[in-house]
Protein backbone atom coordinates (compact mmCIF):
# COMPACT_ATOMS: atom_id res chain seq x y z
CA UNK A 1 0.00 0.00 0.00
CA UNK A 2 1.28 3.44 -0.95
CA UNK A 3 0.78 5.90 1.95
CA UNK A 4 -0.44 9.40 1.13
CA UNK A 5 2.27 11.90 1.95
CA UNK A 6 1.41 15.27 3.50
CA UNK A 7 1.37 18.01 0.89
CA UNK A 8 1.96 21.75 1.08
CA UNK A 9 2.10 24.31 -1.74
CA UNK A 10 5.58 25.06 -3.03
CA UNK A 11 4.60 28.35 -4.64
CA UNK A 12 2.30 31.30 -4.20
CA UNK A 13 -1.34 30.71 -3.25
CA UNK A 14 -3.88 33.23 -4.51
CA UNK A 15 -7.45 33.27 -3.26
CA UNK A 16 -10.38 34.96 -4.99
CA UNK A 17 -12.75 37.14 -2.97
CA UNK A 18 -16.45 37.49 -3.80
CA UNK A 19 -16.19 34.23 -5.75
CA UNK A 20 -19.49 32.71 -4.62
CA UNK A 21 -22.81 34.27 -5.62
CA UNK A 22 -24.00 34.44 -1.99
CA UNK A 23 -20.85 36.38 -0.96
CA UNK A 24 -21.18 38.73 -3.91
CA UNK A 25 -24.85 39.36 -3.10
CA UNK A 26 -24.05 39.95 0.58
CA UNK A 27 -21.40 42.57 -0.21
CA UNK A 28 -23.17 44.17 -3.24
CA UNK A 29 -24.81 47.00 -1.22
CA UNK A 30 -21.38 48.13 0.07
CA UNK A 31 -19.74 48.08 -3.37
CA UNK A 32 -21.05 51.53 -4.24
CA UNK A 33 -19.44 53.03 -1.12
CA UNK A 34 -15.92 54.51 -0.83
CA UNK A 35 -13.17 53.76 -1.55
CA UNK A 36 -14.15 52.12 -4.87
CA UNK A 37 -17.77 53.27 -5.39
CA UNK A 38 -18.45 50.46 -7.88
CA UNK A 39 -18.51 46.70 -8.13
CA UNK A 40 -15.18 45.08 -9.06
CA UNK A 41 -14.61 44.77 -12.82
CA UNK A 42 -11.91 42.12 -12.42
CA UNK A 43 -11.25 39.34 -9.91
CA UNK A 44 -10.34 40.50 -6.41
CA UNK A 45 -7.43 38.37 -5.20
CA UNK A 46 -5.51 37.94 -1.96
CA UNK A 47 -2.33 36.02 -1.16
CA UNK A 48 -1.93 33.30 1.47
CA UNK A 49 1.64 33.45 2.76
CA UNK A 50 3.76 30.35 3.48
CA UNK A 51 3.24 30.62 7.26
CA UNK A 52 -0.46 29.87 6.70
CA UNK A 53 0.13 26.44 5.11
CA UNK A 54 -0.87 23.43 7.25
CA UNK A 55 -0.98 19.79 6.22
CA UNK A 56 -4.12 17.69 6.27
CA UNK A 57 -4.81 16.52 9.82
CA UNK A 58 -2.69 19.24 11.44
CA UNK A 59 -3.87 20.79 14.68
CA UNK A 60 -4.49 24.48 14.04
CA UNK A 61 -4.97 26.93 16.91
CA UNK A 62 -7.98 29.07 16.03
CA UNK A 63 -9.33 31.92 18.12
CA UNK A 64 -13.08 32.37 18.30
CA UNK A 65 -14.77 33.41 16.15
CA UNK A 66 -13.19 32.02 12.98
CA UNK A 67 -14.62 31.80 9.48
CA UNK A 68 -14.24 28.46 7.71
CA UNK A 69 -13.63 28.48 3.99
CA UNK A 70 -13.94 25.06 2.38
CA UNK A 71 -12.73 25.43 -1.20
CA UNK A 72 -11.05 23.69 -4.09
CA UNK A 73 -7.56 24.79 -5.11
CA UNK A 74 -6.34 24.44 -8.68
CA UNK A 75 -2.70 23.52 -9.24
CA UNK A 76 -1.44 25.44 -12.26
CA UNK A 77 1.16 23.89 -14.56
CA UNK A 78 1.59 22.02 -17.82
CA UNK A 79 0.96 18.33 -18.49
CA UNK A 80 4.56 17.43 -17.70
CA UNK A 81 3.93 18.71 -14.17
CA UNK A 82 0.98 16.37 -13.53
CA UNK A 83 3.22 13.55 -12.34
CA UNK A 84 4.89 15.96 -9.93
CA UNK A 85 1.49 17.09 -8.64
CA UNK A 86 0.46 13.47 -8.06
CA UNK A 87 3.74 12.89 -6.23
CA UNK A 88 3.00 15.83 -3.94
CA UNK A 89 5.09 18.51 -5.62
CA UNK A 90 2.98 21.30 -7.13
CA UNK A 91 4.75 23.53 -9.60
CA UNK A 92 4.67 27.23 -8.73
CA UNK A 93 5.27 28.57 -12.23
CA UNK A 94 2.31 29.22 -14.49
CA UNK A 95 2.92 27.60 -17.86
CA UNK A 96 0.65 28.19 -20.84
CA UNK A 97 -1.01 25.44 -22.82
CA UNK A 98 -1.50 25.43 -26.60
CA UNK A 99 -4.33 28.00 -26.36
CA UNK A 100 -2.28 30.36 -24.19
CA UNK A 101 -4.27 29.58 -21.04
CA UNK A 102 -2.73 27.97 -17.96
CA UNK A 103 -3.16 24.21 -17.74
CA UNK A 104 -4.66 22.75 -14.57
CA UNK A 105 -2.23 20.09 -13.29
CA UNK A 106 -4.44 18.98 -10.40
CA UNK A 107 -6.94 19.93 -7.71
CA UNK A 108 -6.66 20.03 -3.93
CA UNK A 109 -9.19 20.46 -1.13
CA UNK A 110 -8.39 23.46 1.07
CA UNK A 111 -9.82 24.98 4.24
CA UNK A 112 -9.10 28.72 4.00
CA UNK A 113 -9.58 30.07 7.52
CA UNK A 114 -9.93 33.75 8.38
CA UNK A 115 -11.05 35.98 11.20
CA UNK A 116 -14.22 38.02 10.65
CA UNK A 117 -13.52 41.49 9.25
CA UNK A 118 -15.57 44.48 8.09
CA UNK A 119 -14.23 44.90 4.55
CA UNK A 120 -13.37 42.61 1.67
CA UNK A 121 -11.52 45.43 -0.02
CA UNK A 122 -8.77 45.93 2.53
CA UNK A 123 -8.83 43.29 5.25
CA UNK A 124 -5.71 43.46 7.38
CA UNK A 125 -3.31 40.61 6.63
CA UNK A 126 -3.53 39.47 10.25
CA UNK A 127 -7.14 38.38 9.62
CA UNK A 128 -6.25 36.02 6.73
CA UNK A 129 -2.59 35.10 7.15
CA UNK A 130 -2.30 33.59 10.62
CA UNK A 131 -0.16 30.50 11.21
CA UNK A 132 -1.89 27.37 9.87
CA UNK A 133 -4.85 29.23 8.32
CA UNK A 134 -4.68 27.30 5.00
CA UNK A 135 -5.20 23.60 5.66
CA UNK A 136 -4.20 21.62 2.55
CA UNK A 137 -5.51 18.24 1.46
CA UNK A 138 -3.83 15.84 -0.97
CA UNK A 139 -3.66 16.83 -4.67
CA UNK A 140 -5.64 14.75 -7.15
CA UNK A 141 -5.80 14.58 -10.94
CA UNK A 142 -7.42 17.50 -12.77
CA UNK A 143 -11.16 17.48 -13.35
CA UNK A 144 -13.12 18.78 -16.32
CA UNK A 145 -15.14 21.99 -15.98
CA UNK A 146 -18.34 19.92 -15.86
CA UNK A 147 -16.92 17.70 -13.11
CA UNK A 148 -15.83 20.75 -11.10
CA UNK A 149 -19.22 22.43 -11.42
CA UNK A 150 -20.97 19.27 -10.20
CA UNK A 151 -18.94 19.15 -6.96
CA UNK A 152 -20.16 20.01 -3.49
CA UNK A 153 -17.64 20.35 -0.67
CA UNK A 154 -18.73 19.49 2.86
CA UNK A 155 -16.71 20.66 5.84
CA UNK A 156 -17.04 18.65 9.06
CA UNK A 157 -15.76 19.69 12.49
CA UNK A 158 -15.70 16.95 15.12
CA UNK A 159 -17.96 14.81 12.91
CA UNK A 160 -20.60 17.53 12.44
CA UNK A 161 -21.19 19.16 9.05
CA UNK A 162 -20.68 22.91 9.49
CA UNK A 163 -20.39 24.11 5.90
CA UNK A 164 -21.38 23.05 2.40
CA UNK A 165 -19.99 24.80 -0.68
CA UNK A 166 -21.64 24.06 -4.03
CA UNK A 167 -19.20 24.89 -6.83
CA UNK A 168 -22.09 25.51 -9.24
CA UNK A 169 -22.68 28.76 -7.29
CA UNK A 170 -19.34 30.29 -8.33
CA UNK A 171 -19.54 33.71 -9.98
CA UNK A 172 -18.81 33.29 -13.68
Language model segments and positions:
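Glycine-enriched loop-and-adjacent helix/strand subsegments that border the catalytic/binding cleft
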Residues: 4-172
